[in-house]
Amino acid sequence: PMWPVHTWLPDAHVEAPTAGSVLLAAILLKMAGYGFIRFSLGLFPVASEVFTPLIYTLSVIAIIFTSLIALMQEDMKKLIAYSSVAHMGFVTLGIFTLQQQGIEGSIIQMISHGLVSAALFLTVGVVYDRMHSRLISTYGGLVSVIPKYSILFMLFALASLGLPGTSGFIGEFLILMGAFKDNFLVAVIASIGVILGAAYMLWLYKRVVFGKL
């Protein structure tokens, strides 16, 4: 789901049951990235190089723009959905750096995001089955009620924002290394997305887990 043809994704996640969101985030969203690596780079290397500036532009917009939209969301599933678009922006950016680090980082990022986003949708599904609401304002103070759940939620949120030591960090770090080698300006702009990613995930976690009960 690259920007600007990503608008179907948040609504699809909202309407889908938890299992559907898990499959969509963990498997289906990675098919385009696999196609780029398997077919575009392998069969059409010259065309891939020609279209690199366009993919860079779309990737950077996806990273920054959808991260800002995620910061404005009140629906937990929509927030995670927009974060998925931002993460896929990192994937396409890494692939089209045409650098070893960037491509390897994109592969790691796809695997990492598949696992972490699926886990985040499952954590949302756990509380949705009990409260029948996805709105962040509905929740608060969960740490005092279900502390073990809060710990798991924290681990998945930290992995999503790319904390050093998690799989999310490895993928994003390698992608940015490849980007810095190929285009310094694009890499600097994309780095802002790492900060925004931390902002919306910590904002989500704070309001759901440490807000007023």
Can you name each region flagged by the protein language model?
Residues 1-209:
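Hydrophobic transmembrane alpha-helices and their helix-loop junctions in integral membrane proteins
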Residues 211-213:
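A glycine-biased, small/acidic residue-tolerant capping/turn segment at secondary-structure junctions
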